[in-house]
Amino acid sequence: LNTSRRFGNNDDGYTPGNISCTLEYDYTDWCMARLAEWLGKEGDRAHFDKRALSYATIFDPESGWFRPRNEKGVFSSLPEKGRLQEGYGCVESNPYQQGWFVPHDVEGMIRLMGGREKVLADLKDMFEKTPGDYLWNDYYNHANEPVHHVPFLFNRLGMPSLTQKWTRDICRNAYHDKVTGLVGNEDVGQMSAWYVLAAA
């Protein structure tokens, strides 16, 4: 609890200048709520469940995506590349990649982003623009972990065939015995663990 209070999102529900931390702290808060629930600490559960939904504080309805806010709550100026700008409030990713990280409230994320059809179209577009070798890129960047859950979002959108299509394509083209056969740093086993789970 002390660590969450010290390093988590501020009282306004976000980490200044940072989309990555804001979304990841929200997920941490959701996990804390589940622990509190298991321990029978209803007050703590309610507190952390509420904090876990603060991802909406950094969603900009005007641009239609997540943007970093400064200490005063003002959105940072959009860069020329918009949500494709690596480092714009994100760690080793861009807002387009990082913005899908609301695993604890996918339905809420879908509503916030404009509904099922809009989200489905956006996800399809992301994968269709991804290079076939899955090396480092601005779209579905399998070379780095922030997007590893994204192909599975099609399941939550009622399109499991697209999860199957893209996970099979990734398994086939991002993992092989050539020079580019492992598209990213193994990072404590995440790349191979993803393959084992997705190929099953």
What residue ranges belong to the model's regions?
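Active-site core of glycosidic bond-cleaving carbohydrate-active enzymes
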Residues: L1-A200
